[in-house]
Amino acid sequence: MTVLIAKDLTFEPVVHRYDWTVDEVRELLERPLMDLLWQAQLVHRTANPGYRVQLASLLSVKTGGCQEDCAYCPQSMHNSSDVEGQPDLVVQIQTVLERARAAKDAGADRFCMGWAWREIRDGAQFEAMLAMVSGVRELGLEACVTAGMLTEKQASRLADAGLTAYNHNLDTSPEYYDQIITTRTYQERIETLQKVRSAGITLCCGGIIGMGESTVDRASLLCVLANINPHPESVPINGLVAVEGTPLQDLPAVDPLEMVRMVATARILMPRSRVRLSAGREQLGREAQILCLQAGADSIFYGDSLLTTSNPDVKTDRELLSQAGVHANWEESDE
């Protein structure tokens, strides 16, 4: 299928590109909003007909006590937030699977599980993770894990367990990265993505805006993502949730239209990736969320919490999707 790109009110058939420059991406980000939305709509309707939104539920399996110093994260042991550290606690397998079953009953398509780790370590906790992945897949759900860095062997074992996707965000641009985290390099993140891909697991990889970065930084982040070949299958776009006790606690909320611009540009750059409207959605309001759906977001996190931050409840999201006129799995599950 050919994707249509609008330029100067004309249509040009294009293929997926993996050679974007930062200047090109910045030009997209800074276009007049109506032009940007129009172009994103053309790409989205052509590449992803039907306007169907994937619902992903997210559970924090192991919360707090992380060795990383991510400036935005209340789970870091370096930050003085009120998230209780649980460095040795793993939620029991049966409890996780009960939550997954409840998410499916509510209409979720994907169940995501998070561990606040710098890296996966072999042992009982990893074996429990594998069992959880297998159990989630047996329920008929896609399974996604986020747990930091991993080895090639661990990636292979996760693939054998049936893991659908592994989440490992880039967070921000290579240029701004050391302002946000110093305990892991950008290259280590890229290498983790390569190991995931080599194991045959799909990539879930995106970033966060609102951390003090510039428009050029946002363009650079999107450029790195769009030049991954093939594109990440899922691209979460997060707005900073400034949590008390973290170094970024005093930053203002993200301008909702900046989230709309990020979603629209991601859609144009990565036509068939699932662009997931992720953290910070509660701060956007109904109208901005609908604009994000119009701009090409075709996945949301579904449920009342995202790891350690709040999220709209199921009833609110069902009303939102109905008002926007988009389709999701919960409609069929209620029939």
From Swiss-Prot:
CDD domains: Radical_SAM. Catalyzes the conversion of dethiobiotin (DTB) to biotin by the insertion of a sulfur atom into dethiobiotin via a radical-based mechanism. GO terms for biological process: biotin biosynthetic process. Binds 1 [4Fe-4S] cluster. The cluster is coordinated with 3 cysteines and an exchangeable S-adenosyl-L-methionine. Binds 1 [2Fe-2S] cluster. The cluster is coordinated with 3 cysteines and 1 arginine. Pathway: Cofactor biosynthesis; biotin biosynthesis; biotin from 7,8-diaminononanoate: step 2/2. Its cofactor is [4Fe-4S] cluster; [2Fe-2S] cluster. Keywords: 2Fe-2S, 4Fe-4S, Biotin biosynthesis, Iron, Iron-sulfur, Metal-binding, S-adenosyl-L-methionine, Transferase. Residues 51-281 form the Radical SAM core domain. One of its GO terms (molecular function) is 4 iron, 4 sulfur cluster binding. The gene is bioB. Pfam families: BATS, Radical_SAM. The keyword rRNA processing does not apply. InterPro entries: Aldolase_TIM (IPR013785), BATS_dom (IPR010722), Biotin_synth/BioAB (IPR002684), Biotin_synthase (IPR024177), Elp3/MiaA/NifB-like_rSAM (IPR006638), rSAM (IPR007197). This is Biotin synthase. [2Fe-2S] cluster binds at C112, C144, C204, R276. Belongs to the radical SAM superfamily. Biotin synthase family. Homodimer. It is an enzyme of class 2 (transferase). [4Fe-4S] cluster binds at C66, C70, C73. It comes from Prochlorococcus marinus (strain MIT 9313).
